[in-house]
């Protein structure tokens, strides 16, 4: 079929296999150029098929030469429908790993479930013995817990209603947006989905099965952002969940003294999830413009390659702040960058969006997530959307 992008609201419902493969190759090429470090040898990447999880898997391979087991929850092609981008990304990653003689298998299923945890443990025992790194990089709208209860996350404040400028990405217009406060049940539900409970469940299960090496490292990803976005993000339902994740880090370290749990606080980037959060897309679009002008903007792979080579695996150990977090948002939150962002925020209107916002860069990142807008790909060509992925366990 000829595959074109079909965007509805904030989601692209198609993905291009050749474009996704190009994306993975580009990321691998960049990571490879950053050099090798004495890091992970056998890694489990939970949420391995897109974004930070995919970048982590690529860096484990390219910067550490690691064997990797991944967990994803993706839909394969079905007749007239393409697969989700994570399927195509994973197919290309498996191919790259095979080229390097590295082990790569991926379990496709719900990472929140006991069944997938059991399957991962079975594969680790059979193929890897033990893992020394566990990356937790899940982003999901809902979670079914061990008792069968379904929890759903929401994007709301936790105090009063909040009104602020927002960017409508459908028409590039600036308008005020009001976000209503969440109920206690909605806050709890968001914490259940996006907090640290499942991260702890994974580490408990892996530890009980004796598939973690001594002094194994586990990394979870978080975002804090600037005060500008606190009401909707860090002081909102998502931020409450992220604070629970931070609390979980301490609990894992206390419960398992021979496991080192750490949180990497990352910079703001375009994702499918972030596009739907009120206020945040405008902040990101301004941030992109300001940081690119300053010369310190990082995309996903640039950030995770720096994490692996300069912060996580160093001769002197982790580089953390006073809270024990690895700060990959260090460039974003410098006073100079934030001061410039605030100036642009105050000045931007619908008429001056392109002057103050990197709209083109925002959309380029968005389309790249789905394998579109790569110069080397001929999108007029007929391609097979249904591809076989060696090494995927359903």
Q: What residues fall within each predicted segment?
A:
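A glycine-rich helix->loop->beta "capping" turn
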Residues: 105, 119-148
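The beta1-alpha1 cofactor-binding region of Rossmann-like NAD(H)/NADP(H)-dependent oxidoreductases
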Residues: 108-120, 196
